[in-house]
């Protein structure tokens, strides 16, 4: 066999190494060359085949390419629009959800328009100066911006009734704040009182100035809490309704336990939107910030699975990223006098149709790059629109039932908690989470399903 034949023979027999013109190329180089040689239509088709569609009726997933090949899908006689006879309450519920889903876009657009209008500069320049120096989202001062009035707006009742979102209390949780003893001792109802004697009479006149709030003064006597919310779903819709608003009557079910929902710091980079979140008690999920909030006797809620769990979200699934998430347990040990409370939201993953990417697809790489660069990512999803039921970013009307479990108390403060201590409390946490899941799964439509820990 001559030298040219030997080269051709080696190209055919060796799948990993080929010799041509005296140079060696790895299997990865060959793969890249093949990728470049594919036509755009082939790449598009492979990407479609790598996407799996998860929705009602397709809980096990279906390749998107096969779904698009179905003749009924692309030849629907008409778009399924909302009926004009829809009750006005349902319309208001849809608008409340549309506001929440797109609120960051609306406020970002308002900011750009206000900056472009010279008439608004008298407002925008002082605000932007304040925006640049204010560190409230990261220094624990969200407790000063926490507005019970804003959290209690009727808007949030409409938001929660849309799905609906329901909170289920399965155990009594001692309140953090109880009525102060000063209330029983006839504490002054006014900030300033002036007593003037009407001489020469023995009578006097009392002038009361600046009446105090009618709210009963309270003091911190009980433990604080770290609520762990599972699963994340696409956007943790249930966590927002239950923990960031009074739409589910949080203060009635759990009186004396003010709670701050924690999210990524990126959301506080949009002017006005950051102040909107802070007034709802939403703050950043950094360790330093969480410790400061807990030090002020406020409880916190953490969506434990985070962005990584969002990528695994499927309709009707119970896939959790939890085994390797121990930071919230360590946070409880370092604080002391804290209860760790598992919460499971049945139906959180059912509100959107999901397009899940394959590990080797370009779309998956784009999602992971976005997560590495910006700290978060979201799956590809769709549901319905404001005026139609076929396509849009408004979630479906699917019930979300949030079961709040029993607290796992950490009485002692650990200066430097060991791995064994963290694992011990995490095990207790997982056991309680599994208990409430198995006890209530049949009641809320998860019969026959098991918790699946993907990480």
Give residue ranges: language-model regions.
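Non-catalytic C-terminal accessory region of glycerolipid acyltransferases
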Residues: 2-75, 180, 292-455
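Alpha-helical bilayer-embedded segments of polytopic membrane proteins, i.e.
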Residues: 78-130
